[in-house]
């Protein structure tokens, strides 16, 4: 790991507000939490509800954390697309984002690295698509009411090789 960037709960609203509202189509219905949304119905994520939407899960379902992860990945794809679009229009946008949250994050990334990473993304000629990968495996209800995830060891090993290993000739 070359760098790390851990976002505190307090950073979600400023980051969301900076890119503007994002409309998502939830993959499940959540009604009993601090935020309510319905499966298949458009839901607008704002600074006020971003953290709650990303945190919410149906605690009665064994697959609750997997469904939440799917929502989080969908959100991250839409968020990054908006952030990249804003960066193409304003090259200082990534630094502005960084400055909004630098006091509420844990990171070893500085402004120089933010600028470098943004320039790497903008070098792409076509639309930039960030890849998100998910570890294959099985989720079961464990002791008590906790869900337990067991990765497919072979698939995990192959994924690590695909992502981090390149054969030199």
Predicted regions and their residues:
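Flexible, polar/acidic helix-loop-strand segments at domain edges
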Residues: 11-100
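Structural recognition of the beta-strand scaffold that forms the well-ordered cores
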Residues: 2-6, 52-53, 131-134
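Second-shell loop/turn segments in exported
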Residues: 1-3, 58-67, 83-88, 100-108, ...
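A short linear-motif detector with a strong N-terminal bias
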Residues: 2-4, 31-33, 109-114
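A general secondary-structure junction signal
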Residues: 8, 28, 134-136
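C-terminal solvent-exposed extensions
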Residues: 45, 106-169
């Amino acid at each position: 790991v070359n760098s790390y960037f851990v976002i505190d709960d307090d950073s979600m609203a400023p980051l969301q507000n900076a890119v503007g509202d994002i409309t998502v189509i939830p993959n499940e219905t959540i009604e009993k939490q601090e935020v309510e949304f319905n499966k298949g119905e458009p839901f607008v994520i704002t600074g006020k509800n971003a953290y709650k939407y990303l945190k919410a899960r149906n605690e009665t379902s064994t697959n609750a954390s997997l469904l939440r992860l799917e929502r989080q990945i969908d959100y991250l794809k839409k968020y990054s697309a908006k952030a990249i679009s804003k960066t193409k229009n304003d090259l200082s946008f990534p630094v502005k984002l960084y400055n909004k949250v630098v006091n509420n994050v844990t990171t070893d990334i500085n402004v120089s690295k933010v600028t470098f990473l943004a320039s790497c993304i903008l070098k792409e000629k076509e639309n930039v698509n960030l890849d998100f990968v998910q570890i294959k495996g099985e989720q079961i209800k464990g002791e008590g009411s906790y869900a337990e995830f067991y990765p497919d060891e072979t698939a995990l090993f192959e994924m690590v090789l695909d992502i981090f290993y390149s054969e030199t000739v």
